[in-house]
Amino acid sequence: MDKKLESLTAGMRIPYGGNNVAIVSEKLASEFESGDRLIVIQTTGDLLHIPADVWDISFKTVEQAHNAFLELGSVDDDSITKFFKLFADYLSDDERFSAIKDSNDEDVKIARSKGRSTTRLILSEKMRTDMVAGLRLWENTPSQRGSAIEEINHDGWNVKLITAGLGAVGFIFEGRPNVFADATGVLRSGNTVVFRIGSDALLTANAIVEHALNPALEESGLPIGSVSLINSAERSAGYAMFSDQRLALAVARGSGPAVAQLGSVAKQTGIPVSLHGTGGAWLVGSSNSDPGMFKAVVYHSLDRKVCNTLNTCCITKEAASVLVPEFLAALSEAAEVRGANAKLHITESADPFIPNAWRGTVSIERAEGEVVETQTEEIKIEEIGVEWEWENSPEVTLVVVESVAQAITLCNSYSPQFVASMVTEDDAEFEAFFDGINAPFVGNGCLLYTSDAADESRG
């Protein structure tokens, strides 16, 4: 007979990984109550506590998304197009947006009082414009639902490979309001979405749901639950959602350790996962780089802090005397346009190319406020992949390398292997870079800003 876990005691030994045990702490034992759930990460022994009320919220929300998916197959593409149009229209409406902005201002106020980063939390006019543009893009994207992408013909019969939705896609995002445009993109390919947003942005998220999202869903005729927000500030709501087998795909974006933990929850539940926990784009310059183009790429890749903002720049030694000044000028201009000072991290190899003007102290904007720091600091080679979570002061790492081949090796060893770009006018050099780099997004003369949901939405 199955028995329920009713309580935990301090010192209790919980098996994991086949031959290991985790020990229940006094804190966990005192907080765990009858009806709660315990998830044991089989690779690390982490004990994750899900209170009963949080589990219920997640269960019911995923159920809505799952049921909506079952209904979505009978909804025509015009209704989905209408949803994107209305959602964009409502975000563009100043009266509706005013209520959303009030909630966002409150979120920002609370986050700042806690010393939390607000870089991605502030719902600026630019973020609003980008959200609307993202929704317009989905509005005008042709549907691929039911399209035959391959056909094999035989005598008297044939077989077709036809695109179809996966199901309910679960997203967990950090606290940034613009994820709505990212997450809802999965509707275009016939999927539904259920997501949890970081607690810092929960007031904003609920305001968007009330004033723009739900009205667009209702008026377009999409099933209730096609886009569902797990309305809980508890981190454990993410554990609950990613342990629900009704999800067809789990997508997590945020800090490295937290995302890895969420990924483990989904994987041991049997849910396919797409994870991105550490960001930062890498850029490589060589003697074949056009200096003006190189400067432009650096400058435009520091217009905001997102997961694929320029984070680490590698310049070959033979090109350093030309490209490092261009790099520093672009970094200065990117900071100046924001009314801030830039922060630079360098390896020992880059030190000879840094002028004295960059070696003083400046005011750097941090989550806790302005802090006076040395503008240029030397770091170890093992630290060049650290993602700098900057506020308003652009922050990057500069490495001078012996060759492009060394830059490729460093990128494959220390980067998050997410976005890599090179500026070169030599086709053979770029081909070697492309072949050697292990990253899903690789470019020449650009850094790739991509939607979090772009790949998943193809479903």
Ranges and model annotations:
Residues 158, 227-245:
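A structured beta-alpha segment of the ubiquitous adenosine-cofactor-binding alpha/beta core
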Residues 133, 137-216, 220, 248, ...:
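Conserved small-residue-rich beta-alpha loop and adjacent elements
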Residues 388-395, 414-418, 440-441:
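Conserved glycine-rich beta-strand-loop-beta hairpin in the small C-terminal domain of fold type I
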Residues 1-160:
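N-terminal Rossmann-like NAD(P)+-binding subdomain of aldehyde/semialdehyde dehydrogenases
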Residues 90-95, 174-175, 181-192, 211-219, ...:
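ALDH superfamily catalytic-core signature
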Residues 68-74, 314-315, 393-402, 417-422:
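Short, well-ordered beta-strand elements within core beta-sheets of diverse protein domains
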Residues 449-456:
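Conserved small/polar residues in nucleotide/adenosyl-binding loops
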